[in-house]
Amino acid sequence: MGKKSRVKTQKSGTGATATVSPKEILNLTSELLQKCSSPAPSPGKEWEEYTQIRALVEKIRKKQKGLSVTFDGKREDYFPDLMKWASENGASVEGFEMVNFKEEGFGLRATRDIKAEELFLWVPRKLLMTVESAKNSVLGPLYSQDRILQAMGNIALAFHLLCERASPNSFWQPYIQTLPSEYDTPLYFEEEEVRCLQSTQAIHDVFSQYKNTARQYAYFYKVIQTHPHANKLPLKESFTYEDYRWAVSSVMTRQNQIPTEDGSRVTLALIPLWDMCNHTNGLITTGYNLEDDRCECVALQDFQAGDQIYIFYGTRSNAEFVIHSGFFFDNNSHDRVKIKLGVSKSDRLYAMKAEVLARAGIPTSSVFALHSTEPPISAQLLAFLRVFCMTEEELKEHLLGDSAIDRIFTLGNAEFPVSWDNEVKLWTFLEDRASLLLKTYKTTIEEDKIVLKNPDLSVRATMAIKLRLGEKEILEKAVKSAAVNREYYRKHMEERAPLPRYEESDLGLLEGGVGDSRLPLVLRKLEEEAGVQESLSLTETVSKVKAAENGLVNGENLIPNGTRSENESLSPEESENVTGEESSGSMAKVKERL
C-alpha cells in the first residue's frame, strides 16, 4: 500500500549499542504511563495534554536514538527477494511488478492485460503473519500470560512483527524488509502538522491515537523488562518507542481479517505482496478461499499492461484514511463528516419520540454522518430527523392505529414525507446545525485553498489541510442541499399539495429512498454513519464465512486497514486505558482497562 508508505531509507542491519540504561527509560516510561492514564482532559484542554505527552515521548525518543533495528539499503532493494520468497511458497507472482508511482508511493503495475474479475493474485496462509502465528512464535510464552496481548490482536501482531524483524533468520524477513521504515500516520506528524488539524472532527481521534500508543508503549516497556516470559524475546535489550510506533503503524495500515483454518472464527493478518496494492473507488474484490486456504484477489476492472493495479479498501472517510492509513484520497466517493444528534430528555414529547425511534430501530442519541454525495443524509438520519421534528399528533399517528406500522415502515424513505411542515422543519434544522459546525473552524474554505498552493508545505501538512478543507466542503454542501430541500417542501406546503401515501404495491420504491435502504429501518451499520468501522460481530462474521458458496470471505468489513472482530480491536488508538498493573484478571477486565 504505497500511498501510506512514503519512506525514508533504512540504514543499518542491527541495533546500535545502548547508551542509556533500561532503568532510566523505565523511570521515564513510568512517568509517561501515569500521564497517559489520567482522566480525560476537560474540553479545551486536549491540546495541552497532547503537548505534555508529546514532550515526554520526545524525551524518550532522544535518549533512544540509534537503538532501533533497521535494514541496510532501500526498501525496493528487497523486492526481488520478496517475489522469490512468495513464489517459492505458493503465491502468485506473474502478471504484475512492484513500481514506485511517485505521489502514490509503491504499488503493483500490470505486466500483461488483466480482465475485470480475473483472479490475478493469491497468497497462501503460510505466508501470512497472523495472531495465530504469533502464538506459535517466540512471543507465545508471553502471549499465554499477558491478557492485553490476548485481548488485542492488533497489539499481538505488532509485537510479532517486531520480534520477527529482530530475528535475522525469520521466515518472514523477505516480507518485513520491504515494509516502509516510517509512515504518514498522525503518529509521525510533527507538532505543527498536527496543529493543522485543530478544530477538525479528526483531531480528537488523533489525540486519542497518540495518547493510547504512548500508554501502550510505556506499559509494555515495563512488561518486557520485568516479565519472566519476556526474557527470551529479541526485544529485551532494545525496545524503543520508535520501534513500537513503526510496528503499530505497519499493522494499522495493513491488517486484514481472515478466517482461522477451521473457519470457525476470525483472526488478524498481514498479507505480503497483496498489501502493496493502492486504493481507488470501487467494490471489494478480495476474499479468503477456505478450500485452498489462501487469500485471493480478483481484478476490480480491466487493467492493461503498464496500468497500476488498484483495489478498493472499503467505504472509508478521508478522516479514517488519514488517521489509520496515512493518506488522503482525492475524490473519495465515501467521504463524510460526523454529526452528533439526540432527543433531549427534557423534551416534552421525549417518551413518544423515543418509542417511535425504538420501533424503527434507531437510538434516541447517536452519531450520524453527512455525506459528500447526494443526498447528503442516509435513510437512518432522515428517519431520525423526521421523528425529532414531529408534532404530538404526528407521533400519535406513528404509534396508534392500523396505519402506524406502515408509517414506521416509510420513516426513512424520501418518497413518503410525514407532512410538508415536518420536512420544512427537519431541513431547516439540518441547515442550521451544519452552519453551526462550519463556524467552529478557524479558517475558511478559501483560506485553506490558498495555503494548499504553498510549494513548501510538507506532505503531512498537506494531508491535514486537505482533510480540514474536505470537512468544510461537505458541511457547506449539506447547508446548500438542506436549503434547497427546505424551499422545495415549503412550496409544497404553501400549495397544499397532497401527501403521497404508502401502499404495499410501493414496496419497490423503498429500495430507492435516501441512502438506498430497505425499510423498515433496523439499527444497521451506525458505524458508517459515525464514520467509524465498528467491531464486526463475531457470529456475523463466522456466518459469512460459512455461507460463502466458494469459500471466500468477502465483504465491506473484510478490507485492509480496518476490520474488527469482537476480541480484536484493530487500531491501537482505539484501546482505552492501559494501566501499569500486572497482566491478570478476566478478559473483560482487561478490555475495560484498555
Curated annotation (Swiss-Prot):
List the PANTHER family hit by this protein, alphabetically: ACTIN-HISTIDINE N-METHYLTRANSFERASE, UNCHARACTERIZED PUTATIVE METHYLTRANSFERASE
Locate the SET domain: which residues? 94-314
Q: Which domain of life is it from?
A: Eukaryota
Q: What does this protein do?
A: Protein-histidine N-methyltransferase that specifically mediates 3-methylhistidine (tele-methylhistidine) methylation of actin at 'His-73'. Histidine methylation of actin is required for smooth muscle contraction of the laboring uterus during delivery. Does not have protein-lysine N-methyltransferase activity and probably only catalyzes histidine methylation of actin.
Tell me if Phosphoprotein is a UniProt keyword of this record. Answer: yes
Q: What is this protein called?
A: Actin-histidine N-methyltransferase
This entry's Gene Ontology molecular function terms read:
actin binding; histone H3K36 methyltransferase activity; histone H3K4 methyltransferase activity; protein-L-histidine N-tele-methyltransferase activity; RNA polymerase II-specific DNA-binding transcription factor binding; transcription coactivator activity
Gene3D superfamilies tied to this protein: Rubisco LSMT, substrate-binding domain (3.90.1420.10), set domain protein methyltransferase, domain 1 (3.90.1410.10)
EC numbers? 2.1.1.85
* Organism of derivation: Mus musculus
